[in-house]
């Protein structure tokens, strides 16, 4: 009997065990599609990014005009640039939905997978931040100035640290050059960590909507989930192309069409939409160091999720109290996103402070309490 090359060849068998013969729970829903969509986003962003890097000049006198040159003179440069910019938005949409799925269905109990995933989120946020600086528009420059300046709140070493990151006494040519280097390098670190993320996932296998052990009911990844993922990919690409071709600047900031000017501050400095919730939490605390700590904790709180799980059941599928809290958390994050884009004046300040308190209360206090109450309701 001839052996199947797919199962014996050293390289092919890794691909086979990861994407073809991988035993998968038969009941995983469309919420399990986002992992593959994120992989597709990463490939898309890296590809478009490399093509952009071929024509971009990381120098303050050339950066803005080189981006204009890409969109005007390079063959399909407008498409590559707009797909890269809007691809980032789609990337974060998928990330947030992927994390939401993990929180709802208790996927965080696979600790190693969850921790590598949260680290991936931090790396992606860092990559997006340094990438936003590269076009060297007004919002690029002032965003870089404001966010890097937050590090000056660190006691004793703060100011030195900020100047070390800037490579001078202000955001200047040295800053742009190193940010370009980081923006080019970090996606490859993300790819490496993604491999580790998948390695840990395949140690345990996927979770499923019931949160129960699914070893008794597994089906092969191909053709069932490969085609399901392909459908998700088609829908995502349709959304991306619709956004890119019909309203490419919908999610961007008009200020970024003005070249960076250190002598003129834009009326409202704000980051891209996917950072607005964290920006709102940062602004809701009057103290600089307190704001920075709250900003960091708003993301780092994800590392605490496995520790804070008190329920006997894994998923929120059969836990009404936790469901109410989960959807309140989502609504609250949308409120924070809205507040992050508003000017610093009443009533926005008060709403932002309330929403920030609620954000941490739900995650750190109310959800563990709800889990304990639901355990009592079971007995």
UniProtKB/Swiss-Prot annotation:
Binds 2 heme b groups non-covalently. InterPro entries: Cyt_b/b6_C, Cyt_b/b6_C_sf, Cyt_b/b6_N, Cytb/b6-like_sf, Cytochrome_b, Cytochrome_b_C_euk/bac, Cytochrome_b_N_euk/bac, Di-haem_cyt_TM. Belongs to the cytochrome b family. It is a multi-pass membrane protein. One of its GO terms (biological process) is mitochondrial electron transport, ubiquinol to cytochrome c. A ubiquinone binds at residue 202. Its main location: mitochondrion. The chain crosses the membrane at residues 34-54, 78-99, 114-134, 179-199, 227-247, 289-309, 321-341, 348-368. The keyword Membrane applies. The lineage of its organism: Eukaryota, Metazoa, Chordata, Craniata, Vertebrata. This is Cytochrome b. GO terms for cellular component: mitochondrial inner membrane; respiratory chain complex III. Its cofactor is heme b.
